[in-house]
Amino acid sequence: MNTSHSQAIFGAAQALMPGGVSSPVRAFKSVGGQPIVFDRVKGPYAWDVDGNKYIDYIGSWGPAICGHAHPEVIAALQEAIEKGTSFGAPCALENTLAEMVIDAVPSVEMVRFVNSGTEACMAVLRLIRAYTGRDKVIKFEGCYHGHADMFLVKAGSGVATLGLPDSPGVPRSTTANTLTAPYNDLEAVKALFAENPEAIAGVILEPIVGNAGFIQPEPGFLEGLRELTKEHGALLVFDEVMTGFRISYGGAQAHFGVTPDLTTMGKVIGGGLPVGAYGGRADIMGMVAPAGPMYQAGTLSGNPLAMTAGIKTLELLKQPGTYEKLTATTQKLVAGIKDAAQSAGMSITAASVSAMFGFFLCEGPVRNFEEAKATDSERFGKLHRAMLEHGVYLAPSAFEAGFTSLAHSEADIEATINAFRESFAAVA
């Protein structure tokens, strides 16, 4: 496969941007080789600058659930852009998307739009502290909530990909109030509450972990967190930046039947444009300025382009049969991946929920980040390179979830499974 143009562009980028990229995982540090530079995307496919075509299972890291450049989303954006790219003022489209989010997500009675998942998580942390008058927060090892200082503690893929424990430049004082527990370990959470009476503002987690690979909550875990937070006067926050509108129209909280106090969102709700949001109970959201004293603002928040793309994407997702199709597509893919690995004599643990999936090259089960680290990362790197040669683009990290879309056809899935068969055989 010829990637000479990708190599030349990435080579030039080294002198222009740190590591030659705008986000670390794109540099292929954990899988080896040089990154592929894309030229265009459409449906389930991506084409690089050398003309190579790939079946894409990253989907812009989650937003492209309807497929890249969906014609209805593009048409809506073309109409909207004629009116301007950003107003810096209230926009009627904000009301429309807000109503759709509130209607869909069980916990959300009011919502504030921002520009990224990181922004949403930064704001929600400030909000739970403002509302409770407490400073400490519990997060889970391997859960990633953006690159804000206070969350860069055992933060999963963002740092695992680079082999860093945390990040230089984060003062100890900043993370002194960030407590961590192993995912799926209620006893550890109980111990933290016991050790910090009336000091914990809230618990934040990915209801399905997508930044330490793909890890599902064990039965009773989310329910137990809901009970513990209520018992101790703390707030429960679901980071649904990844799972929101992806595993069901109402997100993970609708899928599992557990309603948090607050929810952060992003990715899908922007239809491929930069967006984030946080929302929840009206009495808590009433703390946010200008309604209340907790300050948070953003120049491009609620801009008409992101709102337009989000509205059209949610309209597409609300159509009957959407999530049944996504589930069937992903289940077929994961079954094929498992069979391909086992046929090659390799250990594998693989699972999916709706349009989100993942696999570890180790014996399961994988219930937390510590167990996830047992995956054979070196072999995954070889597998990743082999899959590229077969025209399949996977996340360039063993600690990232994968994503399917409505655009992936049965033929795409069959081609992908065949690529896995040949690639597993080559790296076994």
Curated annotation (Swiss-Prot):
Cofactor(s) this protein requires: pyridoxal 5'-phosphate
Keyword set, alphabetical order: Chlorophyll biosynthesis, Cytoplasm, Isomerase, Porphyrin biosynthesis, Pyridoxal phosphate
Enzyme class: isomerase
Reaction catalyzed: (S)-4-amino-5-oxopentanoate = 5-aminolevulinate
Gene Ontology annotations for the cellular component aspect, listed alphabetically: cytoplasm
Family: Belongs to the class-III pyridoxal-phosphate-dependent aminotransferase family. HemL subfamily.
Protein name: Glutamate-1-semialdehyde 2,1-aminomutase
UniProt organism field: Synechococcus sp. (strain CC9605)
